[in-house]
Curated annotation (Swiss-Prot):
Signal peptide bounds: none
Keywords attached to this entry: Cytoplasm, Glycolysis, NAD, Oxidoreductase
Record site feature (Activates thiol group during catalysis), residues: 12
The protein's name: Glyceraldehyde-3-phosphate dehydrogenase, cytosolic
Places the protein is found: Cytoplasm
EC number: 1.2.1.12
Additional facts recorded: Plants contain three forms of GAPDH: a cytosolic form which participates in glycolysis and two chloroplast forms which participates in photosynthesis. These three forms are encoded by distinct genes.
A Gene Ontology biological process term: glycolytic process
Organism (species): Pseudotsuga menziesii
Gene Ontology terms, MF aspect: glyceraldehyde-3-phosphate dehydrogenase (NAD+) (phosphorylating) activity
One cellular component term from this protein's GO annotations in UniProt: cytosol
Family according to the record: Belongs to the glyceraldehyde-3-phosphate dehydrogenase family.
Length: 47
């Protein structure tokens, strides 16, 4: 477990018993980044 850029992540290592037995199957690593932003227009309304 760890904190990376404010997100909680879980890291799993692949052991010898978890390896895929057939060479035609591969593991794909996908990285997803979620960016959210909220603007309540407080700066515009308080001008």
């Amino acid at each position: 477990f760890g904190i990376v850029e404010g997100l909680m992540t879980t890291v799993h290592s692949i052991t010898a018993t978890q390896k895929v037995p057939t060479p035609d199957v591969s593991v794909v690593d996908l990285t997803v980044r979620l960016v959210s932003w909220y603007d309540n227009e407080w700066g515009y309304s308080s001008r």
